[in-house]
């Protein structure tokens, strides 16, 4: 349930983009009604998908708050970023802002991990996971560095796809490419950690 909830905005963004692209006339009319004239039919899918992503993230925050009585800081950050960059895309009718949104989020997360470790001597990855697993301090440090490196690279990769390929290719990458890479990263991390968990058990 949590995994699906985490992916909800990305999934709905993808679905909305595809549905809007399949009905260009209706999509264009809808966007023109709410955002005004001067919008080309080709802009409608990304604008509709952006509005859906903002609404989905708001719903995500509300669901988490109703279920748990609190909301994680990174989810608040995600809501702030999608509202700011998605809102700019809707106001200025420019997809550049929403294309930068994943990169800003990835780099914000990587930056928080790095600053916390360097300035405050706090390992945020350890803080997130230590209730579930026990690891030696050097392993926690390597894990923190791996997360910083991975999310920094993901930020660059998002920009590469956004500016090097078509808008539709970027939308596909957001769901399948980025999520696939994250899954591979966490699976690889699991294999790496399993060795240290076995050693700790011995």
Swiss-Prot record:
Q: Which family does it belong to?
A: Belongs to the YciB family.
Lineage of origin: Bacteria, Pseudomonadati, Pseudomonadota, Betaproteobacteria, Rhodocyclales
Principal place where this protein is found?
A: membrane
For this entry, the protein name equals: Inner membrane-spanning protein YciB
UniProt topology in membrane: Multi-pass membrane protein
What would be one Pfam family of this protein?
A: IspA
Q: Cell membrane: present as a keyword of the record? A: yes
Q: Name one GO cellular component term.
A: plasma membrane
What is the purpose of this protein? Plays a role in cell envelope biogenesis, maintenance of cell envelope integrity and membrane homeostasis.
Gene name? yciB
Q: Where are its TM segments located?
A: 3-23, 46-66, 74-94, 100-120, 145-165, 173-193
Keywords from the UniProt entry:
Cell inner membrane, Cell membrane, Membrane, Transmembrane, Transmembrane helix
Q: Where in the cell is it found?
A: Cell inner membrane
């Amino acid at each position: 349930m949590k995994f699906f909830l985490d992916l909800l905005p990305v999934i709905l963004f993808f679905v909305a983009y595809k549905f809007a692209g399949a009905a260009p006339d209706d999509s264009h009319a809808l966007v023109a009604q709410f955002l005004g004239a001067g919008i080309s039919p080709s802009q409608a899918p990304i604008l509709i998908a952006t509005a859906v992503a903002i609404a989905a993230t708001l719903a995500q925050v509300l669901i988490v708050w109703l279920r748990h009585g609190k909301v994680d800081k990174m989810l608040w950050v995600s809501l702030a970023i999608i509202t700011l960059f998605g809102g700019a895309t809707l106001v200025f009718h420019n997809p550049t802002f929403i294309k930068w949104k994943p990169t800003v989020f990835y780099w914000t997360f990587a930056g928080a991990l790095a600053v916390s470790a360097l300035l405050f001597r706090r390992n945020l990855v350890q803080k997130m996971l230590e209730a579930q697993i026990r690891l030696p301090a050097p392993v926690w440090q390597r894990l923190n560095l791996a997360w910083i490196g991975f999310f920094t690279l993901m930020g660059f990769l998002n920009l590469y796809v956004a500016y090097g390929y078509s808008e539709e290719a970027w939308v596909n990458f957001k769901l399948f490419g980025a999520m696939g890479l994250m899954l591979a990263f966490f699976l690889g991390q699991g294999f790496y950690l399993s060795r240290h968990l076995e050693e700790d058990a011995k």
